[in-house]
From Swiss-Prot:
Protein name (record): Protein RecA
Role of this protein: Can catalyze the hydrolysis of ATP in the presence of single-stranded DNA, the ATP-dependent uptake of single-stranded DNA by duplex DNA, and the ATP-dependent hybridization of homologous single-stranded DNAs. It interacts with LexA causing its activation and leading to its autocatalytic cleavage.
Similarity comment: family membership: Belongs to the RecA family.
One GO-annotated biological process of the protein: DNA repair
Keyword presence, Transferase: no
Binding-site positions, ATP: G74, P75, E76, S77, S78, G79, K80, T81
Gene3D superfamilies: P-loop containing nucleotide triphosphate hydrolases
Length: 340
């Protein structure tokens, strides 16, 4: 067994010099600019719930971490904006302030209200170009007043030079440079202000790729590096009521995660006009974890019959908030135990 090292005079001098340096750093840059990890126990990560039980658990910390950059990307109409709007609604439920930078100029007020967003307490900007969008986002972040900012989308952050140029002008690399410069400036401010910054991104196909995945996201590589979490979202099988399509089963995969293990997956229903189906998630996860019993077409929880058929069971849970909360907590506990 190695003997415990006794501090020497030289060590004491070093510690004294370090103390003086840290005091100077804190005086210049503020309290908490530098800290000893051994002297300060790392607190649990503060989060904003995603609006999906399964995704909260796949993220490993119960939601989107505060003070971090999140990238949500996927094909068109896969549920990217829906996922981001649910996060805004969850932040507002906890008393937080939210803002959306609508670079696509396509924000749907009615749909956001249906998903639980208080639009009267939502700040929205519809900028003319990418520089303006990112400048607005940076100023909101530096105010430390906003809990969550959604930028929809990276592909729509068109550089000013491209907008003012002629059709067909070659502006190679402008978009990537804009994103790289903005993220270098914003990252530190996001961390200090504890703001969750969600970038929605689109997929493109690389030309001439014969082997491997030809898909790539827009805006260069900067966002891939600066994002603490990257979520790939895809729509799967349609949800039908007879012949009418009511929504889609949606699959998400956490491809990058700096706060918990990556590569976890989640599935949930996105119903048109309603967003993520919480009751559907409770049924599916409950059956998977043996919390809800399925016998033939009947679903039951303990002595409570939930209904015959998935839709009837969903309706029963949707109409009983107390039961929904109880099942949600049991599901969270079961998955935590599974991952521990």
């Amino acid at each position: 067994m190695a003997e415990e090292k006794i501090p020497t005079v030289q060590d004491e001098k070093k510690l004294q010099a370090l103390r003086m340096a840290t005091e100077k750093i804190e005086k210049t840059f503020g309290k908490g600019a530098i800290m000893n990890m051994g002297a300060n126990t790392v607190e649990d990560v503060s989060v904003i719930p995603s609006g999906s039980i399964g995704l909260d658990l796949a993220l490993g910390v119960g939601g989107y971490p505060r003070g971090r950059i999140i990238e949500i990307y996927g094909p068109e109409s896969s549920g990217k904006t829906t996922l981001a709007i649910h996060a805004i609604a969850e932040a507002q439920k906890a008393g937080g302030l939210a803002a959306i930078i609508d670079a696509e100029h396509a924000f749907d007020r009615t749909y956001a209200e249906k998903l639980g967003v208080n639009v009267d307490n939502l700040w929205i900007a519809q900028p003319d170009n990418g520089e303006q969008a990112l400048e607005i986002a940076e100023q909101l972040i530096r105010s430390s007043a906003v809990d969550i900012i959604v930028i929809d989308s990276v592909a729509a952050l068109t550089p000013k030079a491209e907008i003012e140029g002629e059709m067909g002008d070659n502006k190679v690399g402008l978009h990537a440079r804009l994103m790289s410069q903005a993220l270098r400036k914003m990252t530190g401010a996001i961390s200090k202000s504890n703001t969750t910054c969600i970038f929605i991104n689109q997929l493109r196909e690389k030309i001439g790729v014969l082997f491997g995945n030809p898909e790539t996201t827009t805006g260069g590589n900067a966002l891939k590096f600066y994002a603490s979490i990257r979520i790939d979202i895809r729509k799967s099988t349609p949800i039908k009521d007879g012949e009418e399509i009511m929504g889609h089963l949606t699959k998400v995969k956490v491809l990058k995660n700096k706060v918990a293990p990556p590569f976890r997956k989640a599935e949930f229903d996105i119903v048109f006009g309603e967003g993520i189906s919480r009751s559907g998630e409770i049924i599916d996860l409950g059956v998977e974890l043996d919390i809800i019993k399925k016998s033939g077409s009947w679903f039951s929880y303990g002595d409570t019959k939930l209904g015959q058929g998935r839709e009837a069971a969903k309706e029963m849970i949707r109409d009983n908030e107390e039961l929904a909360e109880e099942l949600t907590e049991k599901i969270r506990e079961a998955i935590r135990n599974k991952h521990s």
